[in-house]
A protein has these predicted regions:
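RNA-binding basic/glycine-rich loop and surface signature characteristic of RAMP-family CRISPR effectors
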Residues: 1-309
Length: 309
């Protein structure tokens, strides 16, 4: 499943009271453009998912064809969800024949179907949540100068993050946005043609860890073994030891009961010593995600919002 589809599911699953950035469409034919409003100060999805806006300059004295470009690299990086074990799609044929006259040929349609355990990586760059670039030699501004001043006027601050001048929202709003995202992950829904293919889309297994850098060392924990999805507790244990200097808290495993059969109980036994040392937490995905969201919202992990470099 494409990363774009996964991001669409997350965006569509945001709480009903969370406003999303309006989409603007302009131009005609081959010169059409579509982009969001580009206001990460106002909209959580512009902040976390990023955007790019390139429009013709309307400033007095602007040269013909000159454009204004504002861009925000994604704060939430997502990978393509790929089947852990090779799975061959099959063709499903359907017909539409309701109210057709007797002897009339039905309308035939087909689509591909598959069942698979899909896995992918995800990275949330916490120091950049609610932090917007205003300029730099090699960095496009996320906000024009006037809006940057507006952020500061509403309680924001000016900072330098990774050698780039930025404005930053108050910590309370930054905490809230991360908490909303985590709770959305716990109840994500989506998929096409749900009238016929409705099903649970919430994660069966999540591995969460606060890492000081941007490397995910746990991509090989869930793998194929004997043509089945396998959780390798030995790999997890060795990666935790190898990356101990980069980990800034326990590794949290959210694992739905019944997913992968008895492997959940076996992993709990294999990792019992790490759980006793509070280096690993094991629970239901919804419980793990919601608990972490509450901890972040209450300010228990504010140090994660500061760049460690």
């Amino acid at each position: 499943m494409s990363a774009q589809a996964g991001r669409r599911w997350l965006r569509d699953s945001l709480p009903a009271g969370e406003p999303t950035s309006p989409v603007i469409r302009s131009g005609e034919g081959k010169k059409q453009q579509a982009y969001t409003r580009g206001r990460p100060d106002l909209y959580l999805d512009d902040d976390l998912f990023g955007y790019m806006i390139a429009v013709k300059a309307d400033d007095a004295g602007a040269k013909k064809g000159e454009s204004k470009t504002f861009m925000r690299d994604t704060v939430l990086a997502t990978g393509t969800l790929v089947s852990v074990v090779p799975s061959k799609p099959v063709m499903d044929f359907g017909t539409m024949s309701r109210d057709f006259e007797p002897g009339t040929h039905p309308v035939i349609h087909e689509h591909e179907m598959y069942t698979a355990d899909l896995a992918g990586d995800l990275l949330l760059d916490l120091p950049r949540v609610g932090t917007f670039e205003t300029g730099g030699r090699t960095t496009k501004a996320a906000l024009p100068g006037g809006l940057a001043e507006e952020v500061i006027g509403k309680g924001g601050s000016e900072i330098v993050l990774r050698d780039v001048q930025c404005v930053r929202l108050p910590i309370e709003e930054r905490r809230r946005r991360v908490a909303v995202l985590l709770r959305t992950m716990a109840m994500v829904k989506g998929g096409a043609k749900q009238s016929a293919h409705y099903g649970d889309r919430t994660p069966g297994l999540v591995i969460l860890a606060p890492i000081k850098g941007g490397t995910n060392p746990f991509t090989r924990v869930v793998r194929e073994r004997e043509k089945a999805t396998y959780f390798d507790a030995d790999v997890l244990r060795e990666e935790i030891d190898a990356w101990a200097d980069e980990l800034d808290g326990p590794v949290r495993i959210g694992w739905a009961p019944g997913f992968l059969g008895s492997q959940r109980d076996r992993a709990g036994s294999d990792l019992a010593d790490l759980m006793k040392e509070e280096r690993v937490v094991l629970g239901h995905p919804r419980t793990v995600l919601n608990t972490l969201a509450s901890e972040i919202e209450s300010g228990d992990h504010d140090s994660w919002f500061d760049d460690p470099r």
